[in-house]
Amino acid sequence: MIDWKLVARLAGGIAREPPGTGYAQEGLGSFVEDAESRIRAYTAIAPGAPLPAPELVSRRGWIDANIETLRPVMAALEHRLPARAFAAGPLGHLARSATGVTLSAQLGALIGYLSQRVLGQYDIPLLDPTGGTRLLLVVPNLVDTAERLEANRDDLLRWVTLHEVTHAVQFSGVPWLRPLLAENLTQLLDALELRLHKPPPLRMPDGRELHALVDSARRGELAMFAIGRKNRPIVERLQTTMAVVEGHAEHVMDKVGAEVVPTLAQLRAGLDRRRSSRSTPLRVIERLIGLELKLRQYRDGKRFCDGVAEAGGIAALDHVWDSQDMLPSSAELADPDRWMARTAPARTR
């Protein structure tokens, strides 16, 4: 149903690739090795496999990588739609084709918009816990952000790289994390329903319609799929897990960054103002179904991790990775003391 060539063409047109690069690959590999060593020393999480080499990519390169990541996810979703979403016969086929054009245009607009914002990404196959991973750093966005923040470009690159390397250490060193993410996402896809508020056009969107799609992507309003109220616990589990993943990376990038990024305080203040750079393809899915979290995932997750580490040290926070049962509930995410009280017996064994 989705025309991926159309998705790529629209996304590339919206991305507006700027000329030039501004960063060199030289020395980045050694920095990643040093970052991994520092993160392991601070968190006591040991990766189970070598981390992927860092890649400096263009917006187009980020688009291509995310299309490949999203294709199996959307294919799994498409597989569930025909029997319940479209009538049989020629009219059903026509409706399916028109819906495919609309959905392709939405995805293209959304991916193109995000390609202008994302700074870095630890890219994992969302439904395949054993698939290969990539560590992507989006050069034009890093350059643009450094200029906007009036920040040191090399410091920004190091700091963002620390964030993504922390994700790499998490997902490689916590054996249950990727399977849990895949399981939760599969449950979410199973629960989604296709909702068409008006018949989609059987054609490419014109300039006015494409502009409206980009504006909707910016506001997180591309809700072509919806999840029923009874399935909200699935969403809550996925969101809470990702809040811990992101909050932990935010905590670590600041603690370890203090050792290697001289302008950390300036970067933290500037990035908190910018906060549109979350680095996972789940952002695309969230916006497509109206579940954009914006600041919440960073803010709540970091507040939880900072609170636990302040109360019990990094050793206490490390226990959040012991098992799925040690992940906080949504209530505990907002109140680290509740998590500390519940998990005290397990943490002291």
Q: What is each residue range found by the language model?
A:
Residues 1-74, 78, 311-349:
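N-terminal low-structure segments adjacent to metalloprotease catalytic domains
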Residues 25-28, 154, 242, 298:
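Solvent-exposed, acidic/flexible segments
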Residues 31-140:
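Auxiliary, metal-adjacent structural segments of Zn-dependent hydrolase domains
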Residues 108-119, 172-261:
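Post-HExxH zinc-binding segment in Zn-dependent metallohydrolases
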Residues 128, 135, 141-142, 146, ...:
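Terminal, compositionally biased segments used for targeting/anchoring and flexible tails
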Residues 141-160:
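Short pre-active-site segment immediately N-terminal to the catalytic Zn-binding motif
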